[in-house]
């Protein structure tokens, strides 16, 4: 910008002051109700896989790094990663590479205190397990498997499933589900992580089986205060069998959770408000985070949800459905 010298000119001085004033990033509160727009399906499973599902996504160096579960025609589970890509429109052309180990329902994040990447998942050598790496884009660069959690839950046909891990300044927390109307939590000192949460846990939410089913995710809300400092989403099964997400909020990761957008008619994300036309199910996924670290921070001004959906004309066993990725963007 060019400035003209004008003695005593308040206009030129004002412009100069404005030019030197840094812009302040606006902070948004979580909405009380949600309305989204949706992409179409963003990628198709490569040959040999029938579904891409259970997504975890981080943005590092301006690119999305996505890990996911896969299923085949027999309903067997595996896992994969996409080649890193910068825009959602590039996901269809990104490479799809099977992991050399099964990392089903994965959670990927950068553990900042020890400068290491962590990939947590289920159905390994313990109830939940993890591996570490210096480069999450190198599928062959992960460490040997270590125990993340060794506990067992009762009243569940699946045992503990669909973990997520998040940290605050002092502790790391493990949240998980069991397809049984309960959400569970375990914790440990952040100084002891990466490591095992052991076998102890507590039930933090309890209700009808279909209302608290699976796919729990927990996030720090950027700029959040009081009871909306943390956001939890949980996958539910609706009255007609379609999957949707309910949301809960809390003032601390170790505290109590309060229902926010928690009905099928007014969900966090579902058929009622997704804007999606290619799927009637909004299922297991991950909100796009501000940064890749253990705080799992999301920006309520720019919420996006990477989710799994499927053609409404497809039916049958859940594990045989042709799940594909899509992205919801919150309408402002």
From Swiss-Prot:
SUPFAM superfamilies: Arabinanase/levansucrase/invertase (SSF75005). Glycans are attached at residue 313. Residues 1-26 form the signal peptide. It comes from the Eukaryota. It is an enzyme of class 3 (hydrolase). It is found in: Secreted. Keywords: Carbohydrate metabolism, Glycoprotein, Glycosidase, Hydrolase, Polysaccharide degradation, Secreted, Signal, Xylan degradation. InterPro entries: GH62_arabinosidase, Glyco_hydro_beta-prop_sf. Transmembrane segments: none annotated. Disulfide bonds: none annotated. Its main location: secreted. It catalyses: Hydrolysis of terminal non-reducing alpha-L-arabinofuranoside residues in alpha-L-arabinosides. GO terms for cellular component: extracellular region. One of its GO terms (biological process) is L-arabinose metabolic process. Pfam families: Glyco_hydro_62. One of its GO terms (molecular function) is alpha-L-arabinofuranosidase activity. Its EC number is 3.2.1.55. Belongs to the glycosyl hydrolase 62 family. Alpha-L-arabinofuranosidase involved in the hydrolysis of xylan, a major structural heterogeneous polysaccharide found in plant biomass representing the second most abundant polysaccharide in the biosphere, after cellulose. Releases L-arabinose from arabinoxylan. PANTHER family: ALPHA-L-ARABINOFURANOSIDASE AXHA-2-RELATED. This is Probable alpha-L-arabinofuranosidase axhA.
């Amino acid at each position: 910008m060019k400035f003209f010298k004008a003695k005593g000119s308040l206009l030129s001085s004002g412009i100069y002051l404005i030019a030197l004033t840094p812009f302040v990033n606006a902070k948004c509160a979580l909405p009380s109700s949600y309305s989204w727009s949706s992409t179409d399906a963003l990628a198709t499973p490569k040959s040999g896989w029938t579904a891409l599902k259970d997504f975890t996504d981080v943005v590092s160096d301006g690119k999305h790094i996505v890990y996911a579960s896969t299923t085949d025609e027999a309903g067997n589970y595996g896992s994969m990663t996409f080649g890193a890509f910068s825009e959602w429109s590039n996901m269809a052309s990104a490479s799809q590479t099977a992991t050399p180990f099964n990392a089903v329902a994965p959670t990927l994040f950068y553990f900042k205190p020890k400068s290491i990447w962590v990939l947590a998942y289920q159905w390994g050598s313990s109830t939940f397990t993890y591996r570490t790496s210096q480069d999450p884009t190198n599928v062959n660069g992960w460490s040997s498997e270590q125990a993340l959690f060794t506990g067992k839950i009762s009243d569940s046909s699946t045992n503990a499933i669909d973990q997520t891990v998040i940290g605050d300044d002092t502790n790391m927390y493990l949240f998980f589900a069991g397809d049984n109307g309960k959400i569970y939590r375990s914790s440990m000192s952040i100084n002891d992580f990466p490591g095992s949460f052991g076998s102890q846990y507590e039930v933090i939410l309890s209700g009808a089986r279909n209302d608290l089913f699976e796919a729990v995710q927990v996030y720090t809300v950027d700029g959040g205060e009081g009871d909306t400092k943390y956001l939890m989403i949980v996958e539910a099964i609706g009255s007609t069998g379609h999957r949707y997400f309910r949301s809960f909020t809390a003032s601390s990761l170790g505290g109590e959770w309060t229902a926010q957008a928690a009905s099928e008619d007014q969900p966090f994300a579902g058929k009622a408000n997704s804007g999606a036309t290619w799927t009637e199910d909004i299922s297991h996924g991950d909100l796009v985070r501000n940064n890749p670290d253990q705080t799992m921070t999301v920006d309520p001004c720019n919420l996006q949800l990477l989710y799994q959906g499927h053609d409404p004309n497809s039916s049958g066993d859940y594990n045989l459905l042709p799940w594909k990725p899509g992205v919801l963007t919150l309408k402002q």
